């Protein structure tokens, strides 16, 4: 996500306050997460966020030549591979799954400590959308929801403890709600921001007040964010509906611009009184 903020600035003459990156490709040698993109954004006055589409081996026998995936087979679709990787097994010391998550967490810890050493606080959204459709007669979408709510919560706490035990203390934790997944919530002590995804909004720039109010009632002690959307909420609509999300983020191309969020929208949005920008 190195070009979207500049494209928005070109249209609106202001930068958004927050830039969100993804550790999805941390294994790929041609992507240097130690590079200064996030650092320069921070030095320019911006806020830094990271999500992590945590891919694990597809093959149950850990033949790494078969590749990696974060999708479960039921959600992978015909063009992608799925994995049956088990969170329960990953939490059992000494298993291949446990060794895999330790290798991955070790790599991510090095990156997070690098940012911490540069004085960068990170809005951190790992293990997102864990419940998927589990509470609506379907299944989870990603492997971290593969074994249900209790295993997910244990994995979330395991990851959090691992990072803290290894000196990572610059993270603001974001948990994504599906609105009907209270039993998947790790708990107030382990979450800073409760978040929501919203798609199929029909380009109306509403404040999504119904969803905001549901989350506000369920999690009264937490800040609320709209972390993925196709159509951004309008600034005036959020004020009118008393549904002021902490931040909102369109899910990259094609939703940053196009029919969902036009250059004219971005100019009006970033020049609205209640909206903070990097500038």
Regions inferred by a protein language model and the residue ranges of each:
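Substrate-binding cleft of extracellular glycoside hydrolase catalytic domains
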Residues: 27-158, 165-168
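Substrate-binding cleft of secreted/luminal carbohydrate-active enzymes
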Residues: 1, 222-279
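Aromatic- and acid-rich polysaccharide-binding/catalytic face
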Residues: 181-203, 249-252
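Loop/turn elements at helix/coil->beta-strand transitions in domains of secreted/extracellular proteins
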Residues: 14-17, 44-48, 117-123, 164-172, ...
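Acidic (Asp/Glu)-rich catalytic clusters
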Residues: 5-14, 33-45, 74-76, 112-119, ...
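Aromatic-lined carbohydrate-recognition surfaces of secreted/lumenal glycan-active proteins
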Residues: 121, 125-128, 156-182, 221-232
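Alpha-helical scaffolding within the catalytic cores
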Residues: 2-8, 33-36, 108-111, 176-185, ...
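N-terminal module-boundary/linker segments of secreted carbohydrate-active enzymes
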Residues: 1-27, 35-39, 235-237, 267, ...
């Amino acid at each position: 996500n190195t070009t979207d903020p500049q494209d928005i600035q070109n249209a609106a003459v202001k930068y958004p306050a927050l830039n969100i990156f993804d550790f999805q490709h941390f294994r790929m040698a041609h992507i240097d997460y130690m590079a200064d993109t996030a650092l320069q954004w921070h030095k320019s006055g911006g806020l830094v966020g990271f999500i992590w589409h945590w891919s694990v081996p597809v093959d149950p026998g850990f033949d790494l030549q078969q590749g990696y995936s974060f999708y479960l087979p039921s959600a992978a679709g015909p063009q992608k591979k799925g994995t049956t990787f088990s969170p329960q097994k990953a939490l059992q010391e000494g298993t291949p799954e446990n060794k895999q998550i330790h290798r991955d967490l070790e790599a991510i810890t090095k990156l997070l400590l690098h940012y911490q050493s540069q004085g960068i606080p990170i809005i951190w959204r790992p293990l997102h959308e864990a419940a998927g459709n589990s509470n609506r007669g379907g299944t989870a979408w990603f492997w971290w929801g593969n074994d249900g709510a209790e295993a997910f919560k244990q994995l979330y706490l395991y990851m959090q403890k691992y990072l803290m035990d290894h000196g990572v203390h610059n993270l603001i934790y974001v948990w994504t709600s599906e609105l009907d997944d209270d039993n998947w919530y790790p708990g107030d002590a382990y979450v800073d921001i409760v978040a929501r995804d919203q798609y199929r909004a029909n380009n109306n720039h509403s404040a999504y007040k119904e969803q905001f109010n549901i989350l506000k009632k369920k999690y009264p002690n937490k800040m609320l964010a709209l972390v993925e959307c196709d159509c951004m909420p309008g600034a005036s609509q959020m004020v009118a509906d008393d549904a002021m999300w902490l931040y909102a983020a369109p899910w990259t191309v094609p939703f940053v611009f196009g029919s969902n969020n036009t250059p004219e929208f971005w100019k009006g949005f970033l020049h609205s009184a209640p909206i903070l920008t990097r500038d």
